[in-house]
Amino acid sequence: MKSIPKLFGTSGIRGKYQEEITLELALDVARALAKYIGGKNKKVVIGRDTRTSGKIIENVMSAGLQQSGCDVLLLGMVPTPVVGYATLKKEADAGIMITASHNPSQYNGIKLWNSDGLAYKQDQERTIEKLVYEKDFNIVKWNEIGKEYDISSFKDKYIDDIVAKSGINPLKPLKVVVDCACGAGSYLSPEALRRAGMNVITLNAQPDGSFPGRRPEPNEANLGELMKTVKALNADVGLAHDGDADRMIAVDENGNLSDFDKLLTIMAKEFGGTVVTTVDASACLDIQMQKIGGNVLRTPVGDVHVAESINKNKGTFGGEPSGTWLHPDFCMCPDGLLSGLRIVRTIQKNGKLSKQLDAIENYPTIRQKVTCENSKKKTVMSIVEEKFEEEFDDVKEILTIDGVRISFEDDSWVLIRPSGTEPYIRITAEGKTQEHLNSIEKISNEFLNNII
């Protein structure tokens, strides 16, 4: 019996348009989703980012859903969090976001959402894959075909609701530069900040799926213009999004890109209680949360894992160092726009972003990768799980939920995990001192090189 091909990765289905992401696949995924949620009279929300292939994929998926008896609610071009929120508020049975997030313009993808605004879990994705593989669809009669509705006006409600939820003081305006990457947040993110009373300067805020202003990945290599502009205009903060605006990265008032882990920690401290992050996040989060009586739970890499843990453990906040943050008091969908508003609120409340970041201790880190054929990864990781801890004598805690993460008595740590997309084993480590980090790095590399 043939194994069912894997379509979903860590964040939906993703690939190059007309290669991995074909119109035939989009049609079949829509039909499979319709079958999964019950078909006739069910409602599905669809949104898309600015990519040039988005509209035609939207058309095909809408047709597949209607062909299966579902009604389709079209948002048009919107950030991913609008899809999650609309699915929740419109009491739809599912949501679809057509996006490849931070990937280049020739890519696109499909991400699915539950009725509560939570991304599809792995077991749900496996079911969709099985239905697609077996072509197990229910096509309805001519008089049972679903209808299509335009709900693009919902965007205004979303903006009003995130502004209200953010806690921003409109009587204390700050100068904010926002770089939208010509992505799905190009209108909504600046508009939300303006409605919140901020003085807004925009960069790359013209929707364009070829991403002419900068690459959609919000990292230091792509944010030079934002950093220069913040400093030149004496702005209070700069905000940057990826292609679908489910992420947010900040630049401080001096034009320096914020350390991702520290930025996550600043926001987590605002909520307190139980916060959730991934295995690759810095120990600075744990240390700062301990100081205020909170605690940190860790999950495998991927926002859906963070969301599941928040739900299960009544978390107050969650996120990944990449800038993907979840605000459970609003919606379980990662939301870069609300994240940006709330960072502005912390500056109003606590002062300059640079000072907030400087108050969190720096720890030296390394991020490396060791070449390992995909066929060897399972064997290598089983040896890591069984033997790696024996290389150290000051182990405090071991996590094996996504690779192997070893924490040491001084709060240093090392994570070894296989890349999900490339032929590498990744080493991430953080040391309380440079000397300890150097020792961890040497031991980790020697161990891996001996078993690969």
Swiss-Prot record:
Cofactor: Mg(2+)
Post-translational modification summary for this protein: Activated by phosphorylation.
One Gene Ontology biological process: carbohydrate metabolic process
EC category: isomerase
Catalytic activity, EC: 5.4.2.10
NCBIfam families listed in its UniProt record: Arch_GlmM
Family to which the UniProt record says this protein belongs: Belongs to the phosphohexose mutase family.
Xref: HAMAP family: GlmM_A
Protein name, per record: Probable phosphoglucosamine mutase
